[in-house]
């Protein structure tokens, strides 16, 4: 999965997919009542990027729905996965469940079209703080009470705080999550970060009793760091330059081993060689 980083304006969906992304990451900010409000990152952000592009969250979802609904004039067949980077740092811990419920209702109405031929992309809820695990249970409760528990089949999870892998496993246990787990590791492109924790996550993914299904690394903008991440065995790379990742995947060393994921590749299944 080539994951376009910080896609917060509707116009950027086309831009990143046309550069080779089959997945995008979008920032979600919340108001003081735990309503998802804007797709907005803010300053500071990655080096070389504009930090302040934004939409109202529900408007972004409508644009995203068009981009992922077959038959729509804005449809992109290859856009198959969306990571919502949930900026829950502005919330109190006890608001996490409410944030999950409100997020689910927004998605149900504006992205899934109340279950009637909505957008088809898989969705990853990426949460920065392990203490906010109730966002997951709230999300699930809301979809169930709205009569659409089947949409949970399209939803996966990520804790993005680079926490100890044992602590992450524990948070999932508390949230009642068994599967659909993406594990991120990374840092802003302005700084360097080694691959030690990525290798631990990959080892967990490939063990018989691990909790991780997929591992992605962020934010990778250079050819050599792309090669290093692929050599470590990641499933996804988040980038500001999807064309750079696509170029490296075309190199003979990687062409035989990796391919770009399509809609038929289940993002919740651990890949077995």
Curated annotation (Swiss-Prot):
Q: What is its EC number?
A: 4.6.1.-
Sites carrying sugar chains: 250
Which UniProt key words apply to this protein? Cytolysis, Dermonecrotic toxin, Disulfide bond, Glycoprotein, Hemolysis, Lipid degradation, Lipid metabolism, Lyase, Magnesium, Metal-binding, Secreted, Toxin
Q: How is the cofactor bound?
A: Binds 1 Mg(2+) ion per subunit.
| Gene Ontology molecular function, alphabetical | lyase activity; metal ion binding; phosphoric diester hydrolase activity; toxin activity
Annotated active site residues, numbered on this chain, are 5, 41 (nucleophile)
Q: Which InterPro entries match?
A: PLC-like_Pdiesterase_TIM-brl
Kindly state the tissue distribution recorded for this protein: Expressed by the venom gland.
Enzyme class (EC, first level)? lyase
Per the UniProt entry, the disulfide pairs are 45-51, 47-190
- Cellular compartments annotated: Secreted
Binding of Mg(2+) occurs at: 25, 27, 85
Q: Known CDD domains for this protein?
A: GDPD_like_SMaseD_PLD
The GO biological-process annotations, alphabetized, read as: killing of cells of another organism; lipid catabolic process
Give one Pfam family, short name only. GDPD_2
What SUPFAM superfamilies has UniProt attached to this entry? PLC-like phosphodiesterases (SSF51695)
Q: Which GO terms describe its cellular component?
A: extracellular region
From which domain of life does this come? Eukaryota
* Cofactor(s) of this protein: Mg(2+)
Question: Which Gene3D superfamilies does this UniProt record tie to the protein?
Answer: Phosphatidylinositol (PI) phosphodiesterase
Give the reactions, separated by semicolons, that this protein catalyses.
an N-(acyl)-sphingosylphosphocholine = an N-(acyl)-sphingosyl-1,3-cyclic phosphate + choline; an N-(acyl)-sphingosylphosphoethanolamine = an N-(acyl)-sphingosyl-1,3-cyclic phosphate + ethanolamine; a 1-acyl-sn-glycero-3-phosphocholine = a 1-acyl-sn-glycero-2,3-cyclic phosphate + choline; a 1-acyl-sn-glycero-3-phosphoethanolamine = a 1-acyl-sn-glycero-2,3-cyclic phosphate + ethanolamine
User: In which family does this protein belong, per the annotation?
Assistant: Belongs to the arthropod phospholipase D family. Class II subfamily.
Biological function: Dermonecrotic toxins cleave the phosphodiester linkage between the phosphate and headgroup of certain phospholipids (sphingolipid and lysolipid substrates), forming an alcohol (often choline) and a cyclic phosphate. This toxin acts on sphingomyelin (SM). It may also act on ceramide phosphoethanolamine (CPE), lysophosphatidylcholine (LPC) and lysophosphatidylethanolamine (LPE), but not on lysophosphatidylserine (LPS), and lysophosphatidylglycerol (LPG). It acts by transphosphatidylation, releasing exclusively cyclic phosphate products as second products.
What is this protein's record name?
Answer: Dermonecrotic toxin LapSicTox-alphaIB1b2
| Organism the protein comes from | Loxosceles apachea
Q: What is the lineage of its organism?
A: Eukaryota, Metazoa, Ecdysozoa, Arthropoda, Chelicerata
């Amino acid at each position: 999965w080539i994951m376009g980083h910080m896609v917060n304006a509707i116009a950027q969906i086309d831009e990143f997919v046309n550069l080779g992304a089959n997945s995008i990451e979008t920032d979600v900010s919340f108001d003081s009542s735990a309503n998802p409000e804007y797709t907005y990152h803010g300053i500071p952000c990655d080096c070389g990027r504009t930090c302040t592009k934004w939409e109202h969250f529900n408007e972004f979802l409508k644009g995203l729905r068009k981009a992922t609904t077959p038959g729509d004039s804005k449809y992109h067949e290859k856009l198959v996965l969306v990571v919502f980077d949930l900026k829950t740092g502005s919330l109190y811990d006890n608001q996490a469940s409410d944030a999950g419920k409100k997020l689910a209702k927004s998605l149900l109405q504006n992205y899934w079209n109340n279950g009637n031929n909505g957008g088809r992309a898989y969705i990853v809820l990426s949460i920065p703080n392990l203490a906010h695990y109730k966002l997951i249970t709230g999300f699930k409760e809301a979809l169930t009470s709205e009569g659409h528990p089947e949409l949970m089949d399209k939803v996966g999870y990520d804790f993005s705080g680079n926490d100890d892998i044992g602590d992450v496993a524990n948070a999932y246990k508390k949230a009642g999550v068994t599967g659909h787990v993406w594990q991120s590791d990374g840092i802003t492109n302005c700084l360097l970060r080694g691959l030690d924790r990525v290798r631990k996550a990959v080892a967990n993914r490939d063990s018989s009793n691990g909790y991780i299904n997929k591992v992605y690394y962020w934010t990778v903008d250079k050819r050599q760091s792309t090669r290093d991440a692929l050599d470590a065995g990641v499933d996804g790379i988040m980038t500001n330059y999807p064309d750079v990742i696509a170029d490296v995947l075309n190199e003979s060393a990687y062409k035989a081993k990796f391919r770009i994921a399509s809609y038929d590749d289940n993002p919740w299944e651990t890949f077995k060689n």
